[in-house]
């Protein structure tokens, strides 16, 4: 039986991973899974070695204060992956966590194939990372077609797969016409997938909305949030 370890670092990655893996489960029923994941992976029957919330911190200060916990979880994750001995380590987004784990795993056991989903934005910042990534990532799955040229030029194996959440939502659109005014412009607000992000940013975003409404009433503000964060926004 083949084994896949699914490695995520935040709720948005958990959602992306569950969408991709659920499709794989339909075609291949003889694969064993283990993960660092959240509620979405759990819904499709994949257990996590610890709660994803334990590694989702917002901002430099928060990360710094919890650096020993984070490093402990990184080392624990590496140990659990090596013990599970998967054929594939499937890491998703959150490069500061997932790629650090993948690098350590590959160094100890080069036989484990490493596939990373959601390319780190190395063409924007920290371009030097790409040469390092090439040493321990076997294949990168790309969300956006413009990324392919960059990774081709760097001789990194890659495949453009598109964004599954966008594809899935093409036929699953929410009708907001009942609660917005047609003569008003829409401002979309994305507070992030992590609860810590939403809790920190929500007061600032609400102040922004109130400020804008005092200046101009010609706007509708639409929040785009994960299922987990919806109640935080509604109850604020």
What are the residue ranges of the model-derived segments?
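Donor-nucleotide binding loops and adjacent catalytic segments primarily
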Residues: 184, 197-236
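Charged active-site motifs of nucleotide-sugar-dependent glycosyltransferases
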Residues: 2-4, 181-188, 219-220
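Active-site and donor-binding regions of nucleotide-sugar-utilizing enzymes
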Residues: 3-177, 189-201, 211, 215, ...
């Amino acid at each position: 039986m083949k084994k896949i370890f699914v490695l995520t670092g935040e709720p948005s990655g958990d959602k992306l991973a569950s969408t991709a893996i659920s499709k794989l489960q339909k075609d291949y029923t003889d694969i064993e899974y283990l993960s660092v994941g959240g509620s979405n992976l759990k819904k499709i029957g994949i257990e996590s070695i610890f709660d994803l919330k334990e590694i989702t911190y917002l901002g430099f200060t928060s990360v710094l204060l919890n650096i020993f916990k984070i490093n402990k979880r990184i080392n624990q994750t590496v140990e659990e992956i090596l013990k599970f001995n998967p054929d594939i380590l499937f890491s998703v987004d959150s490069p500061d966590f997932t790629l650090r784990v993948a690098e350590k795993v590959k160094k100890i056991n080069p036989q484990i194939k490493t596939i990373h989903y959601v390319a780190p934005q190395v063409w924007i910042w920290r371009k030097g990372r790409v040469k390092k990534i090439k040493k321990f990532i076997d294949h990168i799955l790309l969300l956006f077609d413009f990324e392919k040229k960059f990774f081709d030029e760097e001789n990194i194996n890659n495949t453009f797969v598109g964004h599954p959440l966008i594809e899935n939502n093409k036929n699953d659109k929410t009708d907001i016409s009942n609660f917005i005014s047609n003569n008003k412009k829409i401002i979309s607000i994305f507070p992030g997938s992590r609860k810590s992000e939403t809790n920190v940013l929500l007061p600032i975003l609400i102040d922004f909305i109130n400020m804008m409404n005092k200046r101009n009433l010609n706007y509708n503000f639409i929040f785009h949030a994960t299922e987990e964060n919806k109640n935080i926004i509604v109850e604020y």
